[in-house]
C-alpha cells in the first residue's frame, strides 16, 4: 500500500474514532440516519468521495437490490471500502477510481448520489465542480444526500470542536458552516428538500435535481 494511502487511512481512522464517540453516546448511528434520507430504493446509487466507505453498508442493508458504485481517486482506498462491504456481508460493490470533478459516468444515469464527509476536504472551487458533476450524472428528479460537519453549539463544545478541526481538517472547513453547505448545493443547480442539524457534529442535506 502506498505511503499516501496509509496516511489517508490513518486520518480516516482517527476521524471516525473521534466522531463515533458522541454518536454512540447521544444518538443513533449518523450513517444509518444518512441512508434513511432516501425513502425510495434507488436503482443506481453513486457514492462520491468514498474514502473507506463507512456509510455503504448502511445503504446496502436498506436497499439490498440497489447497484452501488463507489468513486474515489485513490484505488487503494477503494479496495478498503470493498473490504468493509465484504466484512459486512455485502458483495458486488463496483469501484471507480476517478476524479469526482470529471467522472467516467454517463449523464443522467444515477437515481441517487451520496457524499459523506468528503466535501469539506476540498476548497470552494473544487466543491462546486464536484457538486456540478453530481448534478450531471443524476437523472432529473434524482436525489443528492450530503453528510458533513456542522458548527458546534455552546462555548465548551465550540472550543473543543475548533481544536479538533485545527488538528485534523483543512483551513477552509468553516466555509460549509452556517448555511454555507446548503447554499453551495443550491448554487450547483439542486433544490434543497431537507436539512437535519440534530445529529452530533453532523449536518445532513437532502437535495433534488430539478426535472428537465
Locate predicted features:
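Conserved alpha-helix/loop element of class I SAM-dependent methyltransferases that forms part
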Residues: 25-42
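A short acidic, Gly/Pro-enriched loop at the edge of an enzyme's catalytic core
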Residues: 101-113
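A short glycine-rich, Lys/Arg-flanked "PGG" loop and its adjoining helix->strand segment in the class I
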Residues: 128-140
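Conserved SAM-binding loop of SAM-dependent methyltransferases across substrates and taxa
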Residues: 52-63
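Conserved SAM/SAH-binding beta-strand->alpha-helix loop
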Residues: 74-76
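Conserved SAM-binding strand-loop segment of SAM-dependent methyltransferases
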Residues: 89-102
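Conserved SAM-binding loop
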Residues: 81-82
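C-terminal alpha-helical "lid/dimerization" subdomain adjacent to the S-adenosyl-L-methionine
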Residues: 55, 145-188, 192-204
Amino acid at each position: 500500500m502506498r505511503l499516501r494511502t496509509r496516511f489517508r487511512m490513518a486520518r480516516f481512522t482517527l476521524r471516525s474514532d473521534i466522531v463515533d464517540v458522541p454518536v454512540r453516546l447521544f444518538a443513533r448511528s449518523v450513517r444509518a440516519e444518512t441512508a434513511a434520507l432516501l425513502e425510495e430504493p434507488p436503482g443506481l446509487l453513486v457514492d462520491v468521495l468514498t474514502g473507506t466507505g463507512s456509510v455503504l453498508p448502511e445503504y446496502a442493508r436498506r436497499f439490498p437490490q440497489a447497484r452501488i458504485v463507489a468513486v474515489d481517486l485513490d484505488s487503494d482506498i477503494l479496495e478498503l471500502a470493498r473490504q468493509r462491504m465484504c466484512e459486512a456481508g455485502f458483495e458486488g460493490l463496483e469501484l471507480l477510481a476517478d476524479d469526482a470533478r470529471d467522472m467516467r459516468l454517463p449523464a443522467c444515469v444515477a437515481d441517487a448520489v451520496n457524499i459523506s464527509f468528503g466535501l469539506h476536504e476540498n476548497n470552494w472551487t473544487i466543491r462546486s465542480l464536484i457538486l456540478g458533476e453530481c448534478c450531471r450524472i443524476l437523472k432529473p428528479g434524482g436525489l443528492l444526500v450530503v453528510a458533513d460537519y456542522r458548527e458546534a453549539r455552546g462555548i465548551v463544545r465550540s472550543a473543543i470542536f475548533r481544536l479538533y478541526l485545527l488538528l485534523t481538517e483543512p483551513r477552509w472547513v468553516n466555509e460549509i458552516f452556517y448555511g454555507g453547505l446548503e447554499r453551495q448545493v443550491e448554487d450547483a443547480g439542486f433544490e434543497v428538500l431537507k436539512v437535519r442539524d440534530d445529529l452530533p457534529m453532523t449536518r445532513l442535506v437532502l437535495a433534488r435535481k430539478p426535472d428537465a
